[in-house]
Every structure is written in structure tokens, then in C-alpha cells.
Amino acid sequence: MFNLPSAVEITINSLNSAGYEAYIVGGCVRDFLLQKTPFDYDIATSATPLETEKVFEGERIIETGLKHGTVTLIKNGMPLEITTYRIDGKYHDNRRPEDVTFTKSLEEDLARRDFTVNAMAYSKKTGVVDIFGGRSDLKNKIIRCVGNADRRFKEDALRIMRALRFASVLGFEIEKDTKKSIFDNRFLLKNISAERISSELSKLLCGENVKDVILEFSEVLEIVLPEIRGMKGFEQKNPHHIYDVLTHTAVATQNAPKETALRLAIFFHDCGKPDTFKLDEKGVGHFHGHPIKSCEKARCAMGRLKFDNATTDLVLTLVKYHDTAIEPIEKGVKKALNKYSPQVFFKLLDIKRADNSAKNPKYNNKSEIDLLEKLAKDILSNGECFSLKDLAVKGKDIINLGVPVGKEIGNCLDFLLRAVINNEVQNQKENLINFLKEKKLKQ
């Protein structure tokens, strides 16, 4: 028996008491069976939207999708989508049905859903309703379309990305007929909006099994990520590498922390390598300037997929500097903390670790990355100076020395910060002023 939130139970009971069927359906049933806490709850009912509104008269209801039979009830602060059992009409844009027909049959409603693991329903009265074998597929870790796979993907091509996402996140295999249909219908992804693609892609990249999905379904993913094409099978011909560019990328992506910006950054970090490849006289491959080229390509991809500005800026910074060396001594780390900010610095270390994990183990530099992290944490915990805001003198102190207001004030502050970072002077106001007078203002 599922432990439903009280708001969900009350809602189902209210519909039942008014003479209507009501079940939780879809992903929340799947999650319960996987012993996970559902993120949200969808309710399917035999009541029409107007009948649902009448049952909950006086309560807060938002008419979120009346055309498709959906209203959202706010119950005890929890939003619950309540949708009438329906049969979808014709799809003409590979995205959504032009119209729907309401039905009194739960089976007909479940038959229109994407995958068997998402086509189950549950109520306390009936237990799990599983008409299409979803429970068995969950147990066997299989993603299988409900009914005809070609029809499902032609109805809504985003289901292709959803299948890959479930394979990545859940670690499930995609059933052979469903898999064949994914490859056959992959070009339909061109009809899907960038926002819907990027939402699924973000979840896919953060999956446990993302490496296998990238490698097995690269032909599918390259429809939305053409950057993959040049990476696939591109041998690096360098002793530091044991994989081609795409395999290296897939392994590194799986080993990066599960954060959207980090996974996107590591996915794009080497996409510029094929464009910068040069063989030296010894037959060794080099990729001088590849971070800049990768950054350019990542900028195009992030814009095309309409990611938000904050995510895009972070991804591009991480891609641009992923291969930049940081001297593993205190002053080197202080310079990096000042350049990137502490937050970005630690994310950059995450990228370097993931990148390192997918290289030749002979050249593993994990210990150096660990040292960089330790030095940074010590600097921060000790409150040491690495940025202008930490400096013991401010602009007004420089002005009081007779330096005219303007660009020279900033030059003096930068001069002092460099001196503090290089251990030429202690970060104390009197020391800094004397140092400035002696070393710079005399000149």
C-alpha cells in the first residue's frame, strides 16, 4: 500500500464520494513502486473538468488545460493536476493532440500514455492497476512503449528524449522494438521546441547511466546536439588519452557531479578538439586552443537550446578554463580564487576531476586537484586575502595619499592585491600604505 499525502487522499476520496473514479497515475505510481518519493502527483478521474470543479466548489482551482481535460486543485498548499480520462485525437505536429475525447474508461486513458512503466494507476480501493505490463517492465528494468512504438513517437516526438532520459536516470534498457523506433523516428525531434528539448536533455545528462546512453544513442542525440558528430570516433593520438573524443566525453560526463551546469560543461568541454587537431613530427596529436573553440561551439548550442543566461554563463566559463593550469601553491590558488570566485573555482575543480577520470590512468593528476582544493579551503577558512574586497585598504585610503580620483586608484589597489597574494607585504593597512608609498608612488 502506498503512503499517499493527505491532500492526495482527500482529493481522491472527495471524487469517489461524488460518484466518480479517481486514481493517481503515471510517474508517481512508477516512483512508489521503485520505492522513491514522487516529485508530484497526477490524478486521473472519470469526472469531466466541470464536474471536478463542482466537487471542489469554493476551493482554489486553476483551469490549466481545460481543452485537454486538466484542472489544477491547490489542496493544503499542494498543486494537484486532475485530468479527465481521455482519448487523444490526431497529432499533426509531433507535439500534442489537436483535440481530445473524454471517456469513462481508465483503460482507454492509460492506453494513450508513452511507456508501460508510466501507464499504471493506483487507488487504495483497487491497488495498482497495470494493464500493459508496466510492473513487470519495472522489475526487469525495461523501457517499452505502450502499444505501437512508431505511433507513440509520431504522436509526440519528445517521447524519444524521454525514453533516453529514463534509460539514463533509471539505468533501464530500452526494449528492441522501442529502440528501433527511436532510431527510425529520430528526425522528428527537429519539430520539438528548444525549451522542451533542453528540459529533457538536462535530466538525461544528470542520469546515473548517461555514458551508455550517449554512446549507444549518439545518432539520436546528434539531431539536437550536432556538436556530437565531429567527436564520434575521433581518435586523439595522444598518450594522455585512451578514448576517442566522444567516449572520453561520455565517461567524463558520467563522473561529474549531478548538477545541470556541470554536466553540460563537461559534455561540451572537448567538442572543439576535432577542429583544432594537429599531429606533430612524432605522430602525437595536439589540440592547442581547443577550450576556446569548444566554448564557441558551446555558446551556439546553449543559445540554440535556449538555456537561461546564468546557466549559459557558468557553462561557458567552465568550458573556457577547464584546461587552464592552476599552480598548486598558495599564491597560485589565491590568483585563481580572485579570477574565478570561490564558487566557480570549486566547480572548475569538479570539471578537472571528471576530465581527469576519463584520461590515461598513467597520467592521473588527482592528487594535484585534491591539493588545489585543500589549499583553497584553507585560504577561505583562514580568511586570507585574495580579492579587493579582502584588502585592508580601500579607494578612499589611496585618495587620502594624494592620488587623483580616477583610473590610478584602481591601479594602486590592484598593485597592492598582487603584492599581498605574492607575500610581498602583509594585508594590514599601515603596511600596505607604506608599501605603496615606497614601491609605487615614489616612481
Residue ranges and their predicted role:
Residues 1-443:
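Catalytic cores of the polymerase beta-like nucleotidyltransferase superfamily
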